[in-house]
Amino acid sequence: PRQWLFSTNHKDIGTLYFIFGAWAGMVGTSLSILIRAELGHPGALIGDDQIYNVIVTAHAFIMIFFMVMPIMIGGFGNWLVPLMLGAPDMAFPRMNNMSFWLLPPALSLLLVSSMVENGAGTGWTVYPPLSAGIAHGGASVDLAIFSLHLAGISSILGAVNFITTVINMRSTGISLDRMPLFVWSVVITALLLLLSLPVLAGAITMLLTDRNLNTSFFDPAGGGDPILYQHLFWFFGHPEVYILILPGFGMISHIISQESGKKETFGSLGMIYAMLAIGLLGFIVWAHHMFTVGMDVDTRAYFTSATMIIAVPTGIKIFSWLATLHGTQLSYSPAILWALGFVFLFTVGGLTGVVLANSSVDIILHDTYYVVAHFHYVLSMGAVFAIMAGFIHWYPLFTGLTLNNKWLKSQFIIMFIGVNLTFFPQHFLGLAGMPRRYSDYPDAYTTWNVVSTIGSTISLLGILFFFYIIWESLVSQRQVIYPIQLNSSIEWYQNTPPAEHSYSELPLLTN
């Protein structure tokens, strides 16, 4: 227990993040299955829209703050960044420990917020006046705000740690332009966290004082404006979605170049600039989430154009991955299957994003299932596919064990069918005008909702199968002899699993 509770070892802390993220992911998945069960037939199942919205809100918060971010940044980031830099550990090992241990209390606060009073049924955006004292009395929203505060502090500390580590602890020979793409992606992600989270903290603190200390930041009666909250929230919220996907971009670059048998990704400098461009542009497009609040036509024109510009660096990344794959004789290992699935489905999600960027179109599609379909394609088939690819790819390094490849391929097919069956029909529902965040719908929408719910059940089976595959691997203890052929990245020069203290003598990297 002491080893885990007080650990300052980046590998142990990374493992804690993985376990925490997997556990939170099961909770978040359970909530999503409840949502799909409710929508699996017309009429009521739970019979209470407040509870339904509490489930939707908790599903979003758990998946974002307690599943994707801990696994990608905390798990893969902690494990791989020091190994890829040739650093003995993170720059601030004890702060690293605190970053992790802030998350269980944060998750507990969120779960408690659902259990007291009526729960926080505000949606993950927590817009006032719905989240204000009149519409949401009681402690639920306050507890959710404190949960976000803790998760935010955790991420800010982690961000400072990663930035410092990369600036100060690169091994001799690893110049910035030769730094692995995954490390670059984590650094850019950390910068985005550092710049966006304080704004969220400000917004939810003002909401807290509006609710409890009689201020009126977001109350027109006292000269406030609920639209101010939306601007503050989305100034955080849009960079946040890039925070969720950028580490995935980094992992996919490594996996594709490795599996293509090439020593680096096509146009790796361009890949770095593309990620920097995405990170920068991510801060100046936030109001595309607010096309329906009545902004000036010139404001809408700007946010439409700026949003579409993000498609350019994203396209550079997609086509560089395809160019990396070009001309190779692929063996379809499980990791490359997930990576190919990522490229294909992330592109679909990106295209629906370009559709929604048009302010005039978005006014029709805003708050319909078209938006739900869009962001689940980039999250449920972008971020999650990247996590799956990365986990399978680096599992032999982390554990020194092998997974059952045949099962993993079957599991990929099950998940691929499941997620597409769940989310593709939602485009049709959105185009037909089915609104988000309602527990019931007119009979006309029944067919595609039934298909979507069947898809979610298939995905659930896929996830359970995945956990069984990991269990089987840990029980069977098949040791790795050679973890990978012709490795293109230095973390593979470690033992499998790596020694508790790798790089106790600093390496010199020559090329």
Swiss-Prot record:
Mg(2+) binds at residues 366-367. Its cofactor is heme; Cu cation. Its main location: mitochondrion. InterPro entries: Cyt_c_oxase-like_su1_dom, Cyt_c_oxase-like_su1_sf, Cyt_C_Oxase_1, Cyt_c_Oxase_su1_BS, Cyt_c_oxase_su1_dom. Keywords: Calcium, Copper, Electron transport, Heme, Iron, Magnesium, Membrane, Metal-binding, Mitochondrion, Mitochondrion inner membrane, Respiratory chain, Translocase, Transmembrane, Transmembrane helix, Transport. One of its GO terms (molecular function) is metal ion binding. PROSITE patterns: COX1, COX1_CUB. Fe(II)-heme a binds at residues 59, 376. Its EC number is 7.1.1.9. Binds 2 heme A groups non-covalently per subunit. GO terms for biological process: electron transport coupled proton transport; mitochondrial electron transport, cytochrome c to oxygen. This is Cytochrome c oxidase subunit 1. The lineage of its organism: Eukaryota, Metazoa, Ecdysozoa, Arthropoda, Hexapoda. The gene is mt:CoI.
